Amino acid sequence: MIEFVRGYVDYVCPEYIVIDNNGIGYQIFTPNPFSFQESRDTIVTVYTYQYVREDTLALYGFRTREERTLFAKLLQVSGIGPKGGLAILAAGQPEQLVEAIEQENETFLCKFPGVGKKTARQMILDLKGKLTAVTAKTFPDLFHLQEESARPHLSALEEAIEALKALGYAEREIQKVVPSLMKENLSTDQYVKRALQQLLK
């Protein structure tokens, strides 16, 4: 089991990042790959979850061990695979997710890509009362939109749209939030976070 990978951010795309560790490039799928964009050519630590199936071997990466723990718990729910787990983590703040599960708010849970009423109900049945260790108190800044000034980038919005598609959002859903995003000058990472906040309203 690989606990973490530490190295340089070599490549960022809508679905994954590549970490260069001593000349070996690790392809790591993350909730929002563009959150690593401003760390290009710097050393980062990515906590990994190794997903092994008969026809699949993949690494999923997170900035904190707590985020990885939440991902692992989501995978225990029938109907949620790695892609769905990443989409849920990218879309919401952890306290929103935990609150929705604890309050049995199926309507909120169904807003996540690929989550229907059956899966939402299963999330509640499987996870209610089991997420107390994974709350905002444990990692209060996780997923929060950073207040730092954005670096203008001509294709930032286009990259964000591709990232949303990679998370499973339909074109028609994305286009609903594009007009408001076009009024702002943000980094790709911030565009993604802003869009996800609006999609969950």
UniProtKB/Swiss-Prot annotation:
Residues 143-153 are annotated as: Flexible linker. InterPro entries: DNA_helicase_Holl-junc_RuvA_I (IPR013849), Hlx-hairpin-Hlx_DNA-bd_motif (IPR003583), NA-bd_OB-fold (IPR012340), RuvA (IPR000085), RuvA_2-like (IPR010994), RuvA_C (IPR011114), RuvA_C_sf (IPR036267). GO terms for biological process: DNA recombination; DNA repair. One of its GO terms (cellular component) is Holliday junction helicase complex. Its main location: cytoplasm. Keywords: Cytoplasm, DNA damage, DNA recombination, DNA repair, DNA-binding. Residues 64-142 are annotated as: Domain II. Residues 1-63 are annotated as: Domain I. GO terms for molecular function: ATP binding; four-way junction DNA binding; four-way junction helicase activity. It is found in: Cytoplasm. Residues 153-201 are annotated as: Domain III. Pfam families: HHH_5, RuvA_C, RuvA_N. HAMAP family: DNA_HJ_migration_RuvA. Has three domains with a flexible linker between the domains II and III and assumes an 'L' shape. Domain III is highly mobile and contacts RuvB. The RuvA-RuvB-RuvC complex processes Holliday junction (HJ) DNA during genetic recombination and DNA repair, while the RuvA-RuvB complex plays an important role in the rescue of blocked DNA replication forks via replication fork reversal (RFR). RuvA specifically binds to HJ cruciform DNA, conferring on it an open structure. The RuvB hexamer acts as an ATP-dependent pump, pulling dsDNA into and through the RuvAB complex. HJ branch migration allows RuvC to scan DNA until it finds its consensus sequence, where it cleaves and resolves the cruciform DNA. Belongs to the RuvA family. NCBIfam families: ruvA (TIGR00084). This is Holliday junction branch migration complex subunit RuvA.
